Amino acid sequence: MVVSKKLMKVGPWGGAGGHPWDDGGHSGIRSITVSYDRSIDSISVEYDRDGLTVPGERHGGAGGTGNHTTQARTTSIKLSFPDEYLTTVSGHYSPIAHGGSPVIRSLAFRTNREAYGPFGVAEGTPFTFPVDGGVIVGFCGRSGWQLDAVGLYVAPLRPERMSDRVQQLGLSAYRAVWQRIGRPQQRHEPVEQLNGNAQIIHKT
């Protein structure tokens, strides 16, 4: 697997609660550990950096939902790196309680070999980011007692396809924001170019 060092940052999806975190982009992903119950309680990712294992920090709570009255389940996904690599992350986000801030309610992962999940509860606004001709090499987002939001770092497997993928995203990869006051309306947010890299910023 040959990954370009040119990265694209997408997201985050979810709410504005908690504190921002950013694992950055790496050579690849070796494992993902998710704790979940009614929402995604926490996520931690073990990365590869030029052949060395890089343990990631746990982002989120210590187990259970927001009031910690239940115990979260934990699942570890170990990829057969470097032959297996992450290509798609999807999920849902919504408030757990009425009037609360949205949090990540579910997550699912797909590699070039397998599908994992979904983990959590598939309720709320769905999101997905499939990578065509590339690989997901990092995570970012927001977290407090739970995982509030999640974003991704993406690198092309073949650098020459980067410009084609950016153009495709600029035309078709928009986030639909549904306003729940009155009749739903749809707003689109295009790709932004930052220092030669594509960055899709989803506002909540």
Specify the residue positions occupied by each region the protein language model found.
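Lectin-type carbohydrate-recognition ectodomains
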Residues: 1-204
